């Protein structure tokens, strides 16, 4: 961390689940620092929990002002488009979120849990039938959330593969060219337009049907309809898949932790929360926000019009909030992590993701108690050039 000038950010290429030491130095010495991301202008990076929470939740920081701007600091070639719920501020954000939230109520998520269990059981049945070794990324981590969010949105099973490929490109930082990313987003928008037309002709009890009805009542524009579909599809499966694959990798690379969960399955809910806190899922990129007025963050005055990036990965390792933050503690009780963000943009699907992670982990422990990696942990291949870090493959046996 430099005290003068601008530091390149992200600090370095992610290495497995390591958190770059520059975050700890920043929290200690310079919790708000000037950085330059691969695309866009310079901005502030905040690394302490309290400042990160402020940026995420304070209405003086705007996401809408970052939408569609070429000068927005970012790690992806393409700027976040306008019309997405991720790129809105209240009251527009509140209007759209209320509509979508009906599909993610606690009751609806609770009712969907048995279906999640059925999907997991089916995937594990197939893994058991084929026998070891198995790639848990391809056989479980990816197909589970794809199936869950697809069923909630009303995507036919035969179409699941289409948006799996699309979303991998939409989340690209360097793995694909800008032209490929733009084409992928356009293709996904086109598919969602087709799906909306299908649901218009034959409505169902699914989220896309509800969004189409809202659009036809003039409560949702065509752009909002398609961008919301993209957000739900990509956010609803890629992040959960990456989190689950990284979680199993972490547990199997520390066999004593896997054994603890096997012996004490009642710890799974708290283990999922600790996995969410401990795993730095994002590879360093975050949505920039713009200050709409001067805001004091610690000793730094962020001027109106300046961009700020908040690192939840760093906040989740802040020793001002978490005891022994670099320890992976499955019995941790005080755990107010920010893995799902905060403020009005806190992840809508947080409870759905928690449910999927819990069901999948509980089932894996029960069905394959002796699960282990087939290669040394340091030889497991990881994805590169994408927003979310995760094993590319997770070869296991039992």
Q: What are these regions, as identified by a protein language model?
A:
Residues 1-398:
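Cytochrome P450
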């Amino acid at each position: 961390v430099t005290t003068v000038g601008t530091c390149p950010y992200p600090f370095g290429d992610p290495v497995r689940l390591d958190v770059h030491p520059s975050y700890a130095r920043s929290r200690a010495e310079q919790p708000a620092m000037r950085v330059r991301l691969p695309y866009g202008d310079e901005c502030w990076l905040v690394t302490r929990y309290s400042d990160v929470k402020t940026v995420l939740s304070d209405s003086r920081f705007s996401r809408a002002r970052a939408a569609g701007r070429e000068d927005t600091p970012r790690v992806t070639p393409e700027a976040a488009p306008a019309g997405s719920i991720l790129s809105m501020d209240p009251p527009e954000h509140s209007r759209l979120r209320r509509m979508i939230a009906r599909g993610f109520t606690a009751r609806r998520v609770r009712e969907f849990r048995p279906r999640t269990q059925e999907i997991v059981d089916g995937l594990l049945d197939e893994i058991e039938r084929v026998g070891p070794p198995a790639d848990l990324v391809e056989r479980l981590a990816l197909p589970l959330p794809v199936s869950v969010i697809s069923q909630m949105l009303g995507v036919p099973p035969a179409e699941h593969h289409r948006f799996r490929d699309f979303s991998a490109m939409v989340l690209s930082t360097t793995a694909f060219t800008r032209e490929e990313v733009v084409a992928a987003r356009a293709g996904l928008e086109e598919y969602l337009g087709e799906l909306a037309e299908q649901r218009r002709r034959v409505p169902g009890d699914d989220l896309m049907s509800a969004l189409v009805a809202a659009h036809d009542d003039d409560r949702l524009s065509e752009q909002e309809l398609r961008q919301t579909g993209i957000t739900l599809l990509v956010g609803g499966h890629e992040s959960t898949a990456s989190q689950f694959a990284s979680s199993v990798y972490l547990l199997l690379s520390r066999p004593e932790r896997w054994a603890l969960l096997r012996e004490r399955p009642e710890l799974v809910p708290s283990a999922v929360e600790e996995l969410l806190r401990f795993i730095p899922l994002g590879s360093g990129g975050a949505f920039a926000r713009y200050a709409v007025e001067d805001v004091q963050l610690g000793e730094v005055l962020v001027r109106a019009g300046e961009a700020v990036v908040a690192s939840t990965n760093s906040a989740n390792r802040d020793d001002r909030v978490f005891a022994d933050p670099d320890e992976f503690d499955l019995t941790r009780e005080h755990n107010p992590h920010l893995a799902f963000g905060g403020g009005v943009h806190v992840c809508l699907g947080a409870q759905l993701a928690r449910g999927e992670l819990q069901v999948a982990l509980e089932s894996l422990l029960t069905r394959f108690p002796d699960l282990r990696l087939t290669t040394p942990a340091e030889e497991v291949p990881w994805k590169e050039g994408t927003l979310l870090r995760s094993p590319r493959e997770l070869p296991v046996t039992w």
